[in-house]
Amino acid sequence: MQSDTLTVQTVPNTTNVTNTEHSMLAKIEENRHIIQTIWEKQNLGKLTECEQFQKRLHSNLLLLAPLADHQQNYHKQQQALLQQQQQQQQALLQQQQQSPVTNVATNTPPTLQHSISSPSPNNFNNNNNANNQFLSPNSPQVAKSSPSQNNPSTPIANTPTTTTTTAATTATNTNTMMSGSSGGVVSPVSNQQQQQSIQSPSQQSVVQRSPSQSLNSSASSIQSLQNIQNTQNTIQQLTNSLTQVKTIIQQYQSQNQQVPQDVISRYHEFYSMLQQQQQNLLQQQSLLQQQQALLQQQQVGNPMQQSNDMQPQTPQQNNMQQQQQPQTPQQTNMQQPQTPQQNSMQPSQQPITQQEYQQIYDKIVSMSSQILLCNQNIQKLQSESYDPHVLQGLQNQVANLEIAQANSLRFLPQQYHVVLFQQQQQQQANQQQLQLMQIKQSKEYMVLTPAQQLIYNQQIQQNHYNQQVILRQQQQKLMAILEQQNQMIAQQQQQQHQMHQQHQMQPQQQQQQHQMHQQSPQQPQQMGMGGNPPSLEMISPMSAVMNGVTSPMNQGMMSSNNGMPTITTSLSAISPTSPIGTNLNMSNPTTTTVANVTTTAATTTTASSSGKEEKEKKKDKKDKDKDKDKDDDDKESKKDKKDKKDKKASKEKTSHWTSEEHNKFLEAVQQFGIKDYHAIAKFVQTRNHHQVRTHVNTYLKNQKKAEAATSSTQVSTPQQQLPIVGTPQQSVGTPQQQQPPIEQTPPPPQQQQQPPQLTPEQQLASQQQQATLQFQQYQQPQDQQQQQYQQYQQYDPQQQQQQPQQQPPPPQTTPPNNENNNNINNNLENTNNNDNGNNNNNEYNSGFDSNSGLNDEMGIGLFGSPGNNSNNNLGISIEGNNFDDNPSISSPGV
């Protein structure tokens, strides 16, 4: 009987091999067509369709490689397994004779006779084929099945074969299922032994291990894998049979015919057998997991734990294993708290169960096999010079699998890494040994001569060595990827730690800045409390006038004759020959010095502190003004580049500025500033912005000339009498006409003196009124200015000698401002005279400050000057070539 089954098994393997070869050739031909299509689509530019074909090619390659290897080695593995089973049975019989206790853990497969006589799916395969031949709606006569067909538990030996044709048609399926039953898939004996191995943990604790038993356990695990595969094949065949029966039933129903009872019963039989096979598959998978756990404990466990390795793990034993892990609770408490993201990226340090370890191990092994297949396919495609896009896709898949392996390995504690790699290497060695055994027992190997066998063995050993090297390289690469990821995680943690420290340091820095900010206003007060007198820049209203922030209280320049405190400075740098010195001597001939006037400590402190604050404000304002001037210059330069064509036209149309245009020009300067050429041109309406720029440059040049002339006249006429503040100062004429200095008519003394009972607020109000009057007089028409100039020429200068004795001595003086007014009014002719010559030559020479006003830049202190309303209210007149070189300060008259 045994010889019959062996002869029967040789038939389907050849047919399966031929079928596999045909399917492989068909796949290869299909891949060639796919590659050709990909090239055509790429030439046409249809990249989306190319990607679809590439995915299809990739899936075909992945399916083709394992199919070819599996079909080539299937027959050899079956023969080797049969011989190994016989050897194992003999070894078990010898062990049973030596010791009364049997090794229940090893799943002894049934004998060949049991597998032949056991109920197997061959019956329903035969019946299924018979039904496929006879059961169809076109042939309503259904052949009655024999009792063996209705009874699935009938042995194969008792199944009658009615005709030779049916036996011939079902030979292949019968033989394939015989090979599956020989592995103990559906055998009741093998299932009973599996249940005994699961349900008898008390007997397993008595078993003593030996090297032969460890080999048997590894062999049994391999056998369990083969049994699982056979069971899966059986389930697949049962599902196919069910689908065929369903199609037959649907055909009957579609033709409104009654379904035969035999077909319905056969459907129920297939369904029940499918459920039974699925249950067997679950039992075999659980048995395989236990066997792998036992094998792992044999390789890893210490001698103290070997007595408990054969038992299935209970929850208590799992808890005991968790307590035996090297990591103690104290070590976990010593670790720093981490965020959930860091915990997800960092390797797990907590103990894991055996089931979790086995799952991770299976994942890594399966991904290693996929990586190996992909590398083989890459080598084949490279040798055949396939499409580089396909190669790139395979390489990307390998990289993704390696990263997935590293991520899976991170979930294991570090002490498990070496154990996992050793277990993987041991599994590879067992598979290679089994493969070598199968090859040596094959008929092809037996036919070879001893010399050929030696060469063949060397080739196999070389292949095995190469596989071992590849596995080690994969493991080393995996550890390198894991280490690189750990370094990246450490760097991220360090950066997060630094950011956390910086975040903690920010409140301290803010607190320090707040303290420094609080200490900064105290420093000027400490400087003011010292005995140093304030400098001229501190209390000089000149810089404040430029910034437009001058006020009587900030400057401390109020004075009166009713005992109010006055603040002065020691002007040690002023010489009697300087214009300021001469003005001081002439305004107060009885006074020898103006300096060293004592003041109270409170007023000195406030003046010094306010002076420093004003100085800081001046600097900030000057910086802002410079930036604004630069921006304005840039904007104007861009506009000038665009309007170069208009300049040529403006040269031809240039004419003298009339008095009305000049008055409008002055009003526009007062409103918009001297730098806003476009606004001034819109206001004047008869000139464009280029002509306005030329007029501004000419106007500023004339102002400088007039200033130089006034400085020279002040030095040459020391006998001039200073006018009282508040008198009209209007004059018309050119600088050439002002050879002798023109003096201003002083008002009668009764109008200038104020009663001593006036308060400082009343004095300030009167000064403001005078300033407004001066501002209104400054804007009078030109004919009124001419009349005042004629009256001013008829004035007798000898009457001024009586006035200084009646006036109170002012602490500071200013030169007469009539020349300044003459300079302003005389600029009209000079501007008109120089318009034609300086139309476009002086367009970029204007250094005027638009924020400080017209007369501030030129150092001419007229009441009502644009941009200096605060100075007008105070009544301070300033004169000098430059602000910082030669200033002169005068307080308002009484």
Curated annotation (Swiss-Prot):
One of its GO terms (molecular function) is DNA binding. It comes from the Eukaryota. Residues 677-700 bind DNA. Gene3D superfamilies: Homeodomain-like. SUPFAM superfamilies: Homeodomain-like. Keywords: DNA-binding, Nucleus, Transcription, Transcription regulation. Residues 649-704 form the HTH myb-type domain. Residues 93-221, 299-353, 492-539, 601-659, 703-852 are annotated as: Disordered. GO terms for cellular component: nucleus. Residues 611-640, 649-659 have a biased composition (Basic and acidic residues). PROSITE patterns: HTH_MYB. It is found in: Nucleus. It holds the Pfam family Myb_DNA-binding. Residues 140-149, 300-309 have a biased composition (Polar residues). Residues 93-139, 150-221, 310-353, 492-527, 710-742, 751-805, 815-845 have a biased composition (Low complexity). InterPro entries: Homeodomain-like_sf, Myb_dom, Myb_dom_plants, SANT/Myb, SANT_dom. This is Myb-like protein K. It comes from Dictyostelium discoideum. The gene is mybK.
